[in-house]
């Protein structure tokens, strides 16, 4: 009995001590939680980093067919992949303009096809299920995704659903949740920015939950990417701008990650950043500039290679959360969020951003901090010259908790971010996004 009484006293004393400590510092538990989060995130990054060489060897990037009129080679690409009837996945505009001559070329080469041309921006779970149903009803054996990131992501997700008929989209969200071979995918980008033609990612919106699912699995990497600049000349200026900044975000976020970088990913990111700084404004001002259009396609591809290896960061995590709630165009969200997050990262990313400032010619002298800040300022200037906003005034305070929850779950749970955020820091960034509108 005495031992029990003594134990109770000790327990009470311990509780009291914790209470006193908490009273002395109300952030006691928050600090402990933050430290645990940092440890878990960094440990997970290091574990994943060890598996990357094996993943790279098992799942090489897509083969590339590039240059003006390269889309004419799609039939021979499909024949090489033994695709006899292909599911063409696209959106309404591209379906009316770019797809018909490609479909006619397939007919001439004896390749059957069926077309789903209702993919929306931020493709939904409902759209993915419709594509899957049409694919199965028509006995298809491959996917041909033509358009921006939305058709490519929808095709990837549909391929995953065909391969795993009993697993809903939500259960495949996260890293390596598909883990099974899917039907061959050929990606034909008509925008220059998403990088989906080379990556293992697909982002799908659940409108009922107002949430975006990021599915990342190496089995979803397309077998071929067809980079034909002639297919991008009809892009409106706004789409040129936002998809171009999307590609820049991929390259920059890849470059500043805490882990996973290697010489190849860094080289791809650097090449992408330089090409974008040299060619995005040209493509924006003259959509028929084929040289600039092709350079932007290559930049998007290179950026995709980079972040397919390293992942991205909080810019994308916040953009995905906002897209789920407000249906914000992904590239536009990245354009607004990127400079704010890069500034918030502070000294953790100054060396990398300083080097990007040097190779782009933005600033070649001064301290790392000065060069990094000049690089961020150059991004803001580029946005301004293309008519993109500096912030968003439509974000409501009542949605902050949900955005914070989703962004932290994605950022801390998936990406090797250079700085690990807690709720307070994420809220600070969201406030800046609103205040700078």
Where are these regions (language model features)?
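Hydrophobic alpha-helical topogenic segments used for membrane insertion/localization
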Residues: 3-26
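C-terminal charged capping/lid subdomain of soluble metabolic enzymes
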Residues: 32-43, 47, 353, 363-437
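ATP/NTP phosphate-donor binding region
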Residues: 32-142
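Short glycine/serine/threonine-rich phosphate/pyrophosphate-binding segments
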Residues: 71-74, 95-99, 125-128, 150-155, ...
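Glycine/threonine-rich beta-strand-loop-alpha-helix active-site module
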Residues: 126-230
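Carboxylate- and glycine-rich phosphate/diphosphate-binding segment that chelates Mg2+/Mn2+
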Residues: 201-310
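C-terminal catalytic subdomain
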Residues: 310-374, 380
């Amino acid at each position: 009995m005495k031992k029990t009484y003594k134990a109770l006293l000790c327990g009470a004393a311990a509780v009291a001590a914790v209470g006193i400590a908490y009273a002395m510092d109300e952030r006691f538990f928050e600090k402990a939680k933050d430290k645990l989060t940092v440890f878990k995130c960094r440990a997970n990054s290091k574990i994943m980093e060890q598996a990357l060489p094996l993943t790279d060897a098992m799942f090489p990037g897509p083969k590339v067919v590039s240059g003006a009129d390269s889309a004419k080679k799609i039939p021979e690409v499909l024949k090489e992949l033994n695709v006899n009837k292909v599911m063409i996945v696209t959106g309404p505009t591209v379906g009316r303009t770019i797809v018909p001559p490609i479909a006619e070329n397939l007919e001439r080469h004896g390749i059957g096809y069926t077309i789903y041309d209702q993919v929306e921006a931020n493709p939904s779970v409902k759209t993915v299920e419709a594509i899957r149903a049409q694919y199965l009803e028509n006995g298809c054996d491959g996917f041909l995704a033509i358009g921006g990131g939305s058709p490519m992501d929808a095709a990837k997700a549909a391929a995953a659903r065909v391969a795993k008929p009993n697993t809903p989209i939500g259960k495949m969200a996260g890293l390596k949740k598909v883990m099974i071979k899917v039907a061959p995918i050929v990606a034909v980008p008509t925008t220059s920015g998403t990088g989906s033609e080379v990556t293992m990612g697909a982002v799908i919106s659940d409108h009922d939950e107002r949430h975006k699912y990021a599915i990342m699995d190496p089995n979803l990497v397309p077998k071929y990417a067809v980079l034909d600049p002639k297919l991008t000349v009809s892009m409106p200026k706004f789409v040129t701008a936002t998809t171009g900044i999307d590609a820049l975000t991929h390259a920059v976020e890849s470059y500043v990650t805490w882990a996973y970088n290697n010489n190849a990913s860094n080289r791809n990111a650097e090449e992408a950043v330089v090409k974008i700084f040299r060619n995005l404004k040209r493509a924006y001002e003259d959509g028929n500039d084929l040289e600039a259009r092709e350079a932007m396609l290559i930049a998007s591809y290179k950026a995709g290679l980079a972040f397919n290896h390293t992942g991205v960061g909080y810019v994308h995590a916040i953009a995905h959360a906002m897209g789920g709630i407000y249906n914000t165009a992904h590239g536009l969200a990245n354009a607004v969020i990127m400079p704010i997050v890069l500034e918030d990262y502070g000294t953790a990313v100054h060396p990398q951003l300083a080097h990007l400032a040097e190779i782009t010619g933005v600033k070649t002298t001064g301290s790392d901090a000065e060069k990094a800040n000049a690089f961020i300022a150059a991004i803001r200037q580029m946005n301004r010259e293309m008519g993109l906003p500096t912030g968003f005034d439509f974000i409501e305070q009542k949605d902050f908790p949900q955005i914070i929850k989703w962004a932290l779950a994605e950022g801390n749970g998936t990406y090797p971010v250079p700085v690990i955020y807690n709720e307070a820091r994420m809220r600070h960034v969201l406030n800046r996004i609103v205040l700078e509108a």
